[in-house]
């Protein structure tokens, strides 16, 4: 089982059978897993912040909201809705795709990057109860 399928199964255990978001280049493999997986539905929206607000509402009603966006530009655009969910203690899982750490070492000025790979994670630490970064060849 790869990480994408594992994450989908965990979301389902917490009551989420929908994932809101906007597919981006660093989330495409995960989005393919969502598309192929039975029992979970992707809900595309036109803006990342709208995906966050929709997932927040879904979490309040169903037990756990889930949203996926791409690295940096997508994650930065979802900050207000994530902060709102955090302030209201709303259960929300935010999945953000990113280039591998090895790739960022070779090409630190890759598109969608700001500062270094920890900048985004450091910002999320202030508006979430927990953050983690998963980096492996077989993840998504």
Label the model's feature ranges.
Residues 1-140:
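N-terminal alpha/beta PP-like core and its mobile active-site loop of ThDP/TPP-dependent enzymes
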């Amino acid at each position: 089982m790869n990480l994408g399928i594992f994450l989908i199964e965990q979301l389902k255990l917490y009551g989420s059978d929908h994932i809101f978001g906007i597919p981006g280049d660093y989330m495409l493999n995960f989005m393919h897993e969502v598309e192929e997986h039975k029992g979970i539905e992707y809900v595309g929206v036109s803006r990342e912040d709208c995906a966050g607000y929709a997932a927040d509402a879904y979490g309040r009603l169903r037990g756990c909201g889930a949203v996926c966006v791409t690295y940096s530009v997508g994650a930065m655009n979802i900050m207000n809705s994530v902060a709102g969910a955090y302030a209201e203690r709303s259960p929300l899982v935010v999945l953000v795709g990113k280039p591998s750490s090895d790739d960022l070492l070779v090409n630190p000025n890759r598109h969608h990057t700001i500062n270094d790979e920890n900048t985004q994670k450091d910002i999320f630490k202030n508006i979430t109860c927990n953050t983690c970064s998963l980096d492996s060849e077989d993840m998504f």
